[in-house]
């Protein structure tokens, strides 16, 4: 049998990963192009939370407290994602666009923040010949604020646009693809930026960070080009009263179980994320792992999360109830954190590595299941406020978790060193308090999640067998 070029092309498109995410309203080519905005957000995420963190502390000699304050600025902006989503839902223009203007201005904010950032960091390091002494802190704060606002605005509007164009059947697969593109953006950016900054100097820092800002604008323009249909509006339509944020939030809160779902996501994210900055130090300080060995902990966590993603997607495709899958993820997390506490007692490095994988497995199961439910919350056909509220809850909880986890460990360690805790002065004490707290939060999350399984709550029924596919209901920021 001779295959024509058209048949071969159609087969190739069918065999592509996430080919089932395409639909008549959002073809695969347009979906792949739209997903480029996630690459730019992933790139900014790597810069703000990873590369520039190291550069400020090691190469520029900025105090760690100042670095922590700067990095926390994008997290402080996260709660406003719900407002940004609502504004994009109710935005009116002569062209009829709702999402594209927010994508565009979010791109400008993000690019502007990255353009200003290298100069402000150089000032922050003390390399200043004129001007007020506080100029470095002020300009660095403005740069991080601009980049943070741009990231949140771009991501919220982009996800809402994808949700608008996708069908009910393909929406989870669409958001799953966007999540994968976010990870790809982070991975590629980390490798390229790290390679470019291997021989560090101030000129190289300026070129790399501003180059990322320029790439942000290029990627996002390609992503948003001809993605939203123009629906011209008359002057009377544009001047008609708009729904207020309070009214929209009231409608969202009126959805059965919506606020409980957000509370579940916040507490669960807090429980799983407090250990993010402590896992590797715990392995090194308590179990005596070398630097090369501790890096495998993060790899094990990521592998566990991937297994949790695949297993949960398979269970959902077989008709499992999403809330019960989430509960199983919480139980796995409880067992994993308990194993972390027992690993130094047995002196078992193998148990500790298995615990790291278990934490990833539990968080993956919990995240996929709850996010599958979140995408179904649509208020009067507007998905922006729901997506914004979801992103605000998740991002805020993750940021608070990192701060609370690190602060708790340091406070307990200092109290023990000062003798306030009597004979309790083990190096593992501060970490133990954090892990026990996380176990308690996981039990609280189970209690909050329980009523959602009842009939009448969000997504109480089982999907038909074979109906669910591998996909995310929302993007975990």
From Swiss-Prot:
GO BP term, pick one: photosynthesis
Pfam family, any one: PUCC
Keyword field: Cell membrane, Membrane, Photosynthesis, Transmembrane, Transmembrane helix
TM annotation in the entry: 31-51, 60-80, 103-123, 130-150, 177-197, 205-225, 248-268, 291-311, 334-354, 359-379, 384-404, 433-453
Keyword rRNA processing annotated: no
Subcellular locations according to the entry: Cell membrane
SUPFAM superfamilies tied to this protein: MFS general substrate transporter
Cited InterPro entries: MFS_trans_sf, PucC, PucC-rel
Membrane topology qualifier: Multi-pass membrane protein
One cellular component term from this protein's GO annotations in UniProt: plasma membrane
Stretches assigned to coiled coil: none
Family: Belongs to the PucC family.
Name of the protein in question: Uncharacterized protein in puhA-bchM intergenic region
């Amino acid at each position: 049998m001779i295959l024509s070029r058209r048949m071969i092309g159609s087969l190739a498109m069918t065999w592509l990963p996430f080919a089932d995410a395409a639909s008549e309203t959002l073809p695969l080519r347009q979906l792949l192009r739209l997903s480029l905005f996630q690459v730019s957000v992933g790139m900014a995420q790597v810069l703000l939370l990873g590369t520039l963190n190291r550069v400020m502390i090691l190469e520029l000699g900025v105090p760690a407290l100042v670095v922590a304050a700067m990095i926390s600025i994008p997290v402080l902006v996260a709660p406003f994602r719900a407002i940004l989503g609502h504004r994009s839902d109710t935005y009116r223009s002569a062209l009829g666009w709702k999402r594209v203007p927010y994508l565009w201005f979010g791109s400008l904010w993000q690019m502007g923040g990255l353009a200003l950032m290298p100069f402000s960091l150089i000032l922050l390091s003390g390399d200043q010949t004129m001007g007020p002494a506080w100029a470095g802190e002020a300009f660095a704060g403005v740069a991080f604020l601009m980049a943070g606002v741009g990231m949140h605005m771009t991501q919220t509007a982009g996800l809402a646009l994808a949700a608008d164009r996708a069908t009910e059947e393909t929406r989870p697969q669409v958001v799953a693809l966007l999540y994968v593109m976010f990870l790809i953006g982070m991975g590629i950016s980390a490798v390229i930026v790290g390679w470019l900054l291997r021989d560090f100097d101030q000129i190289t820092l300026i070129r790399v960070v501003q180059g990322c800002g320029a790439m942000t604008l290029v990627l996002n323009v390609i992503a948003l080009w001809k993605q939203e249909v123009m629906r011209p509006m008359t002057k009377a339509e544009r001047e008609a009263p708009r729904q207020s944020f309070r009214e929209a939030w009231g409608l969202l809160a009126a959805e059965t179980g919506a606020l409980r779902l957000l509370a579940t996501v916040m507490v669960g994210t807090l429980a799983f994320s407090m250990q993010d900055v402590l896992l590797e130090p715990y392995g090194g300080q308590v179990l005596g792992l070398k630097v090369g060995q501790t890096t495998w902990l993060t790899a094990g966590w990521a592998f566990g999360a991937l297994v949790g993603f695949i297993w949960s997607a398979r269970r959902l495709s077989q008709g499992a109830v999403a809330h019960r899958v989430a509960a199983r993820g919480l139980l796995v997390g409880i067992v994993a954190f308990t194993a972390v506490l027992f690993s130094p007692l047995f002196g078992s490095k193998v148990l500790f590595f298995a615990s790291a994988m278990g934490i990833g497995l539990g968080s993956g199961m919990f995240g996929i299941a709850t996010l599958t439910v979140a995408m179904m919350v649509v208020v009067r056909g507007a998905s922006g406020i729901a997506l914004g509220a979801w992103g605000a809850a998740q991002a805020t909880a993750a940021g608070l978790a990192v701060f609370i986890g690190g602060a708790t460990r340091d406070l307990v360690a200092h109290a023990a060193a000062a003798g306030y805790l009597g004979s309790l002065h083990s190096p593992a004490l501060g970490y133990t308090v954090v892990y026990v707290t996380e176990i308690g939060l996981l039990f609280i999350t189970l209690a909050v999640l329980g009523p959602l399984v009842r009939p009448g709550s969000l997504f109480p029924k089982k999907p038909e067998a074979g109906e669910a596919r591998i996909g995310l209901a929302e993007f975990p920021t």
